[in-house]
Amino acid sequence: MKKTVIICIYIFLLLSGALVGLAKEETAQKSENQPVVIPDQAIRLRILANSDSDQDQQLKRHIRDAVNKEITTWVKDITSIEEARRVIRSKLPEIKAIAKETMEKEGANQSISVDFDKISFPTKLYGNMVYPAGEYEAILITLGNGDGANWWCVLFPPLCFLDFSNGEAVKEQEDKEASKKQTEKVLEDVTAKAEKAKKEENEEKEDGTEVKFFLVEWISDLFS
């Protein structure tokens, strides 16, 4: 009986832990689904492709990846908008050089302009981020005629997402999957222990019944 009580307490604790974990995951998921408004003091990156042709759009994406990779390393440890402005202004020639080098690798020959100024942006929902319309400080990279669809993100604070995902987003997804697997494992363990406890309890009852029958037969033999 004592052993059964201990097992029941253990099962209760495991279930409590699993439920708490599920509640935290649900709360975090609700929080992630809430749109986040970018602060006014933000610096964006906008890239205009030469045209909407597949070749020009592909070139834009290659330049986007190369430029964003470098800029992210420059601003990742910056904490003030003033310092971010200073660093970005000083890096404009380097940004143009990166774009030019990438273009040459792709075998393209288009003009490239890189500016850092107030740029007009429309209201846009990007992932779970809300971007109100207005003029924002931004690096504007124009490829060729700049008539194609554009790509843009927020450089500072560093909130750029490539194709709506980055290393951090992937890591969060992996953490969620790991948490789900862990919860499933706990529930499996709880079910197994519960079945084991029930089996042992039934065996104890059977043993008790056998002892009772043995005593009844022994007493009957004494008085027969």
Curated annotation (Swiss-Prot):
Matching InterPro entries: Spore_II_R
GO annotation (BP), single: sporulation resulting in formation of a cellular spore
Keywords noted in UniProt: Sporulation
Source taxon at top rank: Bacteria
Xref: NCBIfam families: spore_II_R (TIGR02837)
Protein name per Swiss-Prot or TrEMBL: Stage II sporulation protein R
Record organism: Bacillus subtilis (strain 168)
Gene from which the chain derives: spoIIR
